[in-house]
Amino acid sequence: MANEVAKLSFWGVRGSTPTVDRATWRYGGNTPCLELITPDGKRLILDCGTGLRILGNRLAASPEKTIDAEILVTHYHWDHIQGIPFFAPLYSAQNKFHFYSFRSDFIGRDSLKRVFEAQMAHPYFPVDLQAMPAQRDFTDVSGGDRFAIGKTRVTTGWLNHPQGCLGYRIETPVGTIVYATDNEPGNLEYERNLRRLAEGADIFINDAQYTPEQLERHRGWGHSSWREGVRIAIAAGVRNLVLFHHDPDSSDKAIDGILRDARAEFENTWAAAEGMVMTLGEDQTDVVIPAVRDGLRREAHFRARVSGLRQDGRPFDQETVIRDLSLHGALIYLDHSPKLQSELQVTIENPGNGDHADRALRGYVVRIEPGPEKDQVGVGIVFTE
């Protein structure tokens, strides 16, 4: 029998508002939405930002006759609900969705349902919620509640965010995922909640909207930094930390720098990216980053020297040949497998007559695949400078 796994897919990772400019294309610009497929086949959707539209289009095109999902919503700010009107499966009567979130002191009874109705009310949207014939059920939960979805147990905890926010601890038969976005450090009660949620988690997804310096200038906005995530991850014995809810003004290069700083203190750190998939099994967690091809690539034959860190953290330095090159990235073959989302130093030998110096570049690892020769790996990189 095949080993059981839980599959976690990232459909939206940006915070506050979607971004579409070129400087953010590698990590992505859609607002929060994750999808978890549990070992017993249950589908959980975490938050309903604009990434929900992309997920919905994928589900609508799938061969599934009935789409059935449990949707856990952390809170009611725009970036966590704005995908609902564009979620294609809600417009098909055979589909079933069960929503969970908290009863807001500002809204009262049926808070989540009323929020969805309000954002689609006239004059804000062409049609209202009645245009969605899918079955919709709503359950109020509060901080500290526990409930089951199939063989998966869910625990909630209050986080420190304006107007309230829930974090979710999701314990599957093969491991634990904690989703704790939108939390500002500094309140002891909420710190204890977050620590309890994160305790021993295999995957800890945490708010990293700001740098530590930016955080000091944004007190009261309800967000955190990579340093706070690292601190909780170490204290709670987390296996993998995922930096999430990237600031809309953070470019890919800025997030690269945040990731480098975090990995210097906690090696098993990842920066959430649209299309990223984390597969959680009983023995390990595998991570796949989406392949990025944003320009015409040409077959090439440039000698190069590549240095970086292997997956076990040891350094390597190797001469190789680049065979697939564009202005934005390359495919290179190495004897050692580097860590995904790590930085490589690439020095390309000038193929001319020696009048020009070799070109030194930095590359960001976006994929790893089997190479053409035994004991080789193909490494896809995007040039960062």
Label each PLM-derived region with a short phrase.
Residues D47, D79, D182, D207, ...:
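Acidic active-site catalytic centers that drive phospho-/nucleotidyl reactions
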Residues H77, F87, Y210, D247, ...:
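Flexible, active-site-proximal loop/turn residues at the rims of small-molecule/cofactor binding pockets
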